[in-house]
Amino acid sequence: MPRRKAAGPPWDAAGPVAAGGGRRRPGAQGGGRRRPRPSGGSSGGSSEEEAPRERRPRDGSPGARRPGRPGGAAAAAPGGPGARGQSVVICEPEHSKERIKLEGSKSRGQLLIFGATNWDLIGRKEVPKQQAAFRNLGQNLWGPHRYGSLGALRVRSVVSGPCAAHSLLITAEGRLWSWGRNEKGQLGHGDTKRVEAPRPIEALSGESIVAAACGRNHTLALTESGAVFAFGENKLGQLGLGNQTDAVPSPTQILYNGQPICKLGCGAEFSMVMDCKGNLYSFGCPEYGQLGHNSDGKFIARAQRIEYDCELLPRRLALFVERTKDGQVLPVPNVVVRDVACGANHTLVLDSQKRVFSWGFGGYGRLGHAEQKDEMVPRLVKLFDFPGRGAAQIYAGYTCSFAVSETGGLFFWGATNTSRESTMYPKAVQDLCGWKIRSLACGKSSVIVAADESTISWGPSPTFGELGYGDHKPKSSTAAQEVKTLDGIYTEQVAMGYSHSLVIARDESEAEQEKLRKLPEYNPRTL
């Protein structure tokens, strides 16, 4: 029998263990540090930050060592050449590791885009000096457009995120394409040059991609065999490579040797991956407790300076809790995770019993616990913990959360408009009562939904076209409205970035193709 890998105590059962069997000291989980900033604001990965203080790796070599093949055989073998100085993530013998073949989305269609396309200006008051040449590229698309360069390319999935100014698409053949902002290499093309229109990621041409996720400046991609590739910003360890390289512009496999991964998600500066057994792992910045390890990673480095201890490798979440009416905190046993969704600084999970847990930054009530307190470990959202009241789908926005119940009702909590009153616990969205929701996505403050034969959106001012209402129509709406510019077009899936929307429009019949041909083409200017 193969030698068993070192196993830690229950709290850290699959957490990193120092090579040679030594438990790492408390307060040094990830070894990463970050520059302080006001604790009340949202994490900002694009601001200028001081390089982390060099720390000596456990193998004694100077500097942060980067292994030759992250996540490869050397890292997997307990006594192999890559075992020294690396963390053991799973505690099971090699022969118990399952082999799986994941399937991507069954939907097929053409990509449509609307919203802001000046990628370097999104979420900023002005374009950074180093991107000044691109200042006048891109525009606000107030209605749906087709990318002229894509022709009739068939797409099965589109991906962005509420913090992201970049986007991804997965073709019907499983190829991953990317475009948008690229200051940290988050497009995976091996450079940091902005890309105006979708372009295939050549480094992943040999892989069949089934899912992907976008953070503020980083990206994760999942292959059909359950392997995860990461690229983009890694200053806070959000790529799971065991180091804090500022940027990794080419796809690199994460340092993980557990069961195959089948779901993933990205927050602003952290990442979540879920294995096929229902275990959840997190890595990146621990601010607000968003990693779920019962700590916000905060420590005082010196006078007037707070830093954060980042998780540089995937670490399993070992504790799920519920709070009783009298304030007792009790562990919830046997949680098997089935889905995960990440907002900017919070996370939702759906388990096998249709329960919802949330944790991270509690501002605006986005966790659904009727209070604004940050949660350091996954906490049960009470509303969905009743027979017949469970959740079937979960979605996380920048400062809000959504869930579709098993009976089809849409529930919302948090805030899309942070200048108005927040919803502190899940409430039914009456405007969408009776609609069968197929797909939902959130931007910074806007929401788009694919339901029945319609596409629906809403969001407060300012908007940049991501609601898709058209050139000569109101640009914002605080109530849900049908997107009339997509009348007669069946939307398979929706995705939303910080202030742009992506839609997969079905093109199976001649009539559907004819409707799509009538939409305007978008051919962005390039330098």
Predicted feature residues:
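Eukaryote-biased RCC1-like beta-propeller repeat architecture
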Residues: 2-527
